[in-house]
Structure formats: C-alpha cells, structure tokens
A protein has these predicted regions:
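S-adenosylmethionine
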Residues: 1-439
Length: 439
C-alpha cells in the first residue's frame, strides 16, 4: 500500500475514534523508515492543522457537505499544499486525485482535482477571521483548536499568552524516553543509542531523560523490549522526582496505569510499592510494563475514589496522577483536540475530589500526598487543591523549591507548579505536594 493511501486509511480510522499513535503502531509495521516518517508526518500535520485545513476547504467549496472519504482526501492534499515544501504542487494534487480514483467515490475525482488546483492557485488570497474583531475565532481557526477552548484561554490568559500556547507544537518524531536504572546506567544506554546510530538530545530538566529523533515504533527497539529504557514524558518524570521517595518507604500510586511513574518510583528502592488501577485491562498492561522494566510491585484493580479500610495510614507517599481532561497534551496529540468538551471538566473535577478525599486517608502522619494532572484547567488543579486544604486541615503545602529541578524553582508558588508546553518545552502538567501533620 502506497504512502498516501495508507495515510488516508489511518486518517479514516482516527476520524472513527481510533487513537493516532495506536493506529500508526498497527499500520506502519513492515514499512521502510522513510515511508514511516512520511506517513506519520503527513498524519500529524493534517490533524494538527485540521481546523484551518477544513476552513480552507469550506472556503473553496461554499461550505457544501462533502463525503467523509473525499474530505479526508482533500485534507491530505491541502496539508501538502500548505505545509510540505518538499512536495511539489503537482504531486499534492495528482496523488490526491489518484486516491479518489481508487475509492468508491471515483466519480468525484474531477471535483477533487478542481478544488485542489483552485486552492493551490489562491492560497495567498484566503481571508481568515479578523484577529481584532474576532480574536477567539481567529485563534480557533489559525491554530486548529475548538472555539470553546480558544475562548477559555483567551479569557484566562489574554491574547498573547493564548496565541503562544495554541501555536506551540513539538515535532511528532521526537520520542521522550528515560534510562531504567534498575537494568542499566545512563552511560551504558547512551553508548547503545549512539552505537545503533540513533539521533537524540538530552532532556530539559531530568538527567536520565532523552528525546530520540525521527523514530516511529519505539516499542520495536530491542532496548525497549529488554527494559533498558522506558517511554515517559519529562513532566511525568518531574512529578515522580517531586515525590522524594526514600529507601524502605511504603508508596502507593493510586491511578497507576500504564505504570510510568510507578516504574520511576521503583528506582528509589521503596520497601513496598502498590499500584492501583480502575480498569482490569489497563492493570494487565501495567503489569506487563512493570515486568519488562524489572519492577516488583503489588498491582490491584481498585477504584481510587473508594476507601480501602485496611490501607488507612499505611503509606509514606501517596501519588495521585488523576484522570483529567489532558489539555496539557493537546500540543502533541492532535487527534484528541476535537474530542474534548467543556462539560467534562467539571465532571472530572468532582471525580478528582473524590479520589483526593479517599487517598488522603492512606497517608501516614508525616507522610506526603502528591497530586498531579496533565491539564491546564483551573477547576482540576488549583481549585481542587484549595478545596482539599479547606476540608483537610491536617495537610499543608510543601515548599517545592527543594523537590524541583533548579530551572523550575522560580515557577513554583505556594507548594504548586503549573507547567505550560510553550513556556517549558514539555507537557502541560500541574503538581502539588501536600504533607500530613505529625501527631
């Protein structure tokens, strides 16, 4: 199957609800590295700019309804015209027409040809919403985010900050990994990566963090399969570091799957590591990941919002990486941008409060509760911590300066840290560390 035909197939799957990373993993097996990179780049770029691309298509088709397969062909074609300088205009148009010719909608090849040629000739004449008159609509179209999210950020942070945040994106080809010190050392892993010819650069904040360039299917690497490295975002590593786990301590990871933070915490030699997960299939995946990485842990299927009586005051550290709206990941997960809805934020905040209330009871006097999310929503972050402290006077906020990488110390405030992708170059995470008073 040719590159663009495969891209069209995967785009259709994503539009039907599949996750892009999983679809790529499944469909790219057996392809050359060059083909993998092109297909992945075409799909990431198309989805990253889907709102703007659709605006362009609608501008040249008078907003008429277009069959979803034909629209996807047009999306891929317009993406190449707008963002792929190495693809000739003629190739972007002609290859798109060929895709329609091979489809059940082959009778529309003339329509696709005419639309793409018209767009190619008039790209510089497209009128976008006015930044001054319609700032939220401008941000939504130009950076391909839902209008409600553009309005939300505009109201919370102002235009310049909102634009910087929405316009930021990271190369899809950079895969963030960390050294698994349970099986190797930093020096040994570096030597193996260099020996295999991989290009990589060091992380921004964590010494054991690396970004491998231009790789699709990292789980196919022998270094991954042997458990020498783990795929994990750098912001997630910062959260695990902030837990300040000491040898021999009892540690609970309350919302643990797929196990990235649990595996990181295991490197600090806790006396007991318990990993809880709500869904059995995710718990099984977590067990597989932990086993591959050489981690010994108790894995339990349990709803973290419900209290386990036998675990009350049993842990020195309790980590809650709460289920959240994941708004801090949208810059690198373009396929989920348009699956988000404002109503879910308040629902998630209520779930998070239930988890906080239950898990706080597992913390020993003098122990710590670490709360994190991968979102930028006030309701799920600061407002939750304010609520929790008001209802749990036995907890107080810890000064994060002692637990953060030096470059982030100035960003912490009152025991909390909010990371932004465009400011910090990593996922948008929230972190709060709370300590329970000693008796």
């Amino acid at each position: 199957m040719k590159q663009r035909q495969l891209a069209l197939k995967i785009l259709g799957e994503v539009e039907e609800g599949s996750f892009l990373n999983l679809a790529l993993k499944k469909q790219l097996k057996g392809l050359s590295e060059q083909d993998r990179r092109f297909v992945a780049a075409l799909l990431y770029t198309t989805l990253e700019n889907k709102g703007r691309i659709d605006y362009v298509i609608d501008s040249f088709t008078s907003g008429k309804r277009i069959h979803k397969l034909v629209r996807n062909v047009l999306r891929l074609g317009v993406c190449q015209l707008m963002f792929f300088e190495t693809v000739p205009e003629s190739a972007a148009v002609n290859e798109s027409v060929k895709l329609v010719e091979k489809s059940p909608k082959r009778q529309l090849k003339g329509f696709v040809n005419a639309v793409l040629r018209n767009i190619a000739q008039n790209l510089g004449k497209i009128e976008y919403p006015s930044q001054e008159a319609e700032p939220a609509k401008y941000l939504s179209i130009m950076y391909s985010y839902p209008l409600w999210l553009a309005e939300r950020y505009l109201g919370a942070y102002g235009f310049d900050f909102a634009e910087a945040m929405l316009s930021y994106h990271k190369k899809a080809a950079d895969t963030c990994v960390r050294v698994n010190r349970l099986k190797t050392t930093r020096q040994e892993l570096l030597a193996k990566l260099e020996g295999r010819g991989y290009q990589f650069h060091e992380g921004e904040y964590i010494p054991d963090c690396f970004y491998i360039r231009n790789i699709v299917g990292v789980d196919e690497l022998d270094l991954f399969q042997k458990g020498l490295l783990a795929v994990q975002g750098e912001a997630s590593m910062i959260v695990a570091e902030a837990a300040q786990v000491r040898p021999g301590q009892a540690v609970l990871d309350a919302c643990a799957a797929p196990g990235g933070k649990s595996a990181y915490l295991a490197q600090f030699a806790p006396g007991r590591l318990v990993c809880m997960e709500l869904h059995e299939h995710r718990a099984l995946l977590m067990q597989e990941n932990l086993s591959r990485l050489g981690v010994e842990a108790e894995c339990r299927v349990w709803d973290a919002s419900k209290i386990l009586e036998e675990q009350i005051e049993a842990f020195d550290r309790v980590l809650i990486d709460a289920p959240c709206s994941a708004l801090g990941l949208l810059y690198r997960k373009p396929d989920i941008k348009y699956t988000k809805h404002p109503e879910e934020i308040q629902m998630l905040a209520e779930t998070q409060r239930a988890i906080l209330s239950a898990c706080a009871q597992y913390v020993k006097p003098g122990g710590r509760l670490i709360y994190s999310t991968c979102t930028i929503s006030q309701e799920e972050n600061d407002q939750n911590i304010d609520w929790f402290l008001e209802h749990n006077r036995q907890f107080f906020q810890v000064n994060l300066a002692a637990v953060l990488p030096e470059r982030l110390m100035s960003r912490a405030r009152e025991g909390r840290l909010q990371l932004f992708p465009h400011l910090d170059g990593i996922d948008g995470f929230f972190l709060a560390v709370l300590e329970r008073e000693k008796r």
